[in-house]
Amino acid sequence: EMPIFSEDRERESGHPAQAHAFLERIAGADALVIGYAEHNGSFSAAYKNIVDWASRVNRRVFQYKPTLMLATSPGAGGAASVLALAEKSAPSMGAELIRAVSVPSFHDHFDSGKGVMREGETASRLAAAVVDLEAAVEAARAAA
C-alpha cells in the first residue's frame, strides 16, 4: 500500500517503489487515458497521493504523452469539477492534452448489460476523442 505523502515521510524514507513503478508504466505507454473519480468536487485521495509522490520523482508526471482525460458521474454534472481541475493542471504535469470528455448521467449513457455506451451524442464525443488520441499517437511515432 502506498503511504500517504508528506515531506516528513519523504525525508525519512525517500520515494516509495510504487511511485517509481507508476512513472515507469507511463514511460512505456504511447498515450494515456485517465479516468477521474470526483470526490467532493476534487481529485480522489488515491489519485492525489500517487501524483504527489510521483511528482517528487519527476515533476512532469505524464511525461508529455498524448492524453485523453475522462470523467463521469451518475448526475448531470458529469464530474465536470474534477475534469476542470485536471485540465488546468495538465500543462504543469506534463500532459499533452488531446481531449477532455465529461460523461454526465452515466447510467443513461451506458448499457451495463452489454458493457457499451448507448448510441448518441455522448458516444459520438467519446469516439471522436479516441480518434484524436490515435492521431496524436501516430503523429508522435512519425516524428520520432
State the predicted function of each range:
Residues 1, 5, 58, 93-99, ...:
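Glycine-rich, flexible loop/turn motifs
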Residues 1-56, 114-144:
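N-terminal beta1-alpha1-beta2 submodule of the flavodoxin-like/Rossmannoid cofactor-binding fold
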Residues 7-10, 104-108:
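Short beta->alpha junction loops
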Residues 49-59, 87-92:
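A glycine- and small-aliphatic-rich helix-loop capping segment at beta-alpha/alpha-beta transitions
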Residues 61, 100, 140-144:
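Short, polar/charged, Gly/Pro-enriched helix-capping and turn/loop motifs at alpha-helix termini
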Residues 62-64, 112-117:
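Glycine-rich NAD(P)-binding loop of Rossmann-like domains
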Residues 63-107, 120-124:
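Short, glycine-/small-residue-rich phosphate/pyrophosphate-handling segment
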